[in-house]
């Protein structure tokens, strides 16, 4: 998600992240990429077992049908928040967090965001753990998950529903659960969205040739977070997300290419 955000030039970016061991190439490569795009990496800590692993199984349509993961040790992030949280949050525009992180990290993040009046956007890697954080969803500005994860969240089978039908059901669930905004991605059908005020709808996916769906969800989340941060409506933010997701699945790269803000409908000029 961070890499997706940094592909939009001239947006101020500050991140507090714990990434893997210093000798592990993937973690170091991510840091180098962020630094190359002038992302502030001062708060990154390289620690043993700081980078987990994830194995995913995809079907012929490019959708994840099974996965297994080894969670990293994320507790160093809590230490970062305790020491530097005020400095980070006071300068941030908004926050993106995985809600299935350690409960103490989520609580500290939400407390700091409330203190400085910052929006917090939530994503999830393991919904089985995310369910244990369900109460926190009411404190998020928006939460993003896929239809399978939404089924776990609401203990409901959403398979067989059209996007329009799913939007109606999700709207009802969101109001009942008092979740401010919820976006549910539905693969090749795009995404559905709903908020507590009754706004709901479907944002179709862009018609493109699929090569590899890896990273599409992260890019969608990046686009959604950027859109909402810069004052776009929920539908408009979803459209930015689908734009970035489409740019990922047409290549073998797992991160979207660089876009100028105005290409995505953001009223921000970039200096030549």
Residue ranges: model-predicted function:
Residues 2-94, 262-272:
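Conserved N-terminal subdomain of the carbohydrate kinase-like
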Residues 9-12, 38, 117, 178, ...:
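Glycine-centered short loops/turns at secondary-structure junctions
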Residues 13-15, 120, 182:
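Hydrophobic/aromatic residues located in beta-strands of well-ordered beta-sheets
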Residues 32-36, 59-63, 137-141, 160-163, ...:
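Short, hinge-like loop/turn segments at secondary-structure boundaries
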Residues 70-74, 124-127, 148-150, 206-208:
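Short, acidic/turn-prone active-site loops that include or flank metal/cofactor-
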Residues 87-88, 135-136, 175:
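Structural alpha-helical scaffold elements that stabilize or flank donor/cofactor-binding regions
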Residues 92-169, 189-191:
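Conserved beta-alpha-beta core of the PfkB/ribokinase-like small-molecule kinase fold
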Residues 129, 156-272:
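Conserved phosphate-binding/catalytic region of the ribokinase-like
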């Amino acid at each position: 998600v961070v890499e997706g955000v940094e592909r939009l030039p001239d947006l101020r970016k500050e991140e507090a992240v714990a990434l893997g061991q210093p000798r592990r190439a993937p973690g170091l490569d991510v840091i180098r990429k962020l630094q190359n795009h002038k992302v502030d990496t001062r708060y990154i800590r390289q620690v043993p077992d700081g980078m987990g692993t994830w194995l995913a199984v995809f079907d012929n349509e490019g959708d994840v049908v099974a996965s297994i993961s080894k969670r990293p040790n994320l507790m160093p992030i809590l230490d970062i928040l305790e020491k530097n949280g005020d400095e980070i949050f006071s300068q941030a525009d908004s926050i993106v967090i995985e809600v299935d992180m350690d409960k103490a990290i989520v609580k500290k993040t939400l407390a700091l965001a409330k203190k400085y009046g910052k929006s917090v956007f939530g994503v999830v890697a393991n919904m089985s753990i995310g369910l244990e954080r369900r109460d926190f969803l009411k404190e998020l500005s928006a939460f993003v998950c896929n239809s399978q994860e939404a089924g776990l969240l609401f203990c409901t089978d959403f398979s067989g529903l059209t996007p329009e039908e799913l939007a109606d059901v999700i709207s009802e669930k969101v109001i009942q659960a008092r979740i401010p905004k919820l976006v549910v991605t539905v693969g090749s059908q795009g995404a559905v969205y709903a908020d507590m005020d009754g706004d709901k709808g479907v944002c179709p996916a862009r018609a493109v040739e699929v090569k590899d769906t890896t990273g599409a969800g992260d890019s969608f989340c990046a686009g959604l977070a950027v859109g909402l941060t810069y004052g776009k409506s929920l539908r408009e933010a979803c459209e930015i997300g689908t734009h970035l997701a489409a740019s990922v699945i047409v290549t073998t790269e797992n991160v979207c290419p660089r876009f100028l803000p105005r290409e995505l409908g953001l009223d921000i000029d970039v200096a030549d």
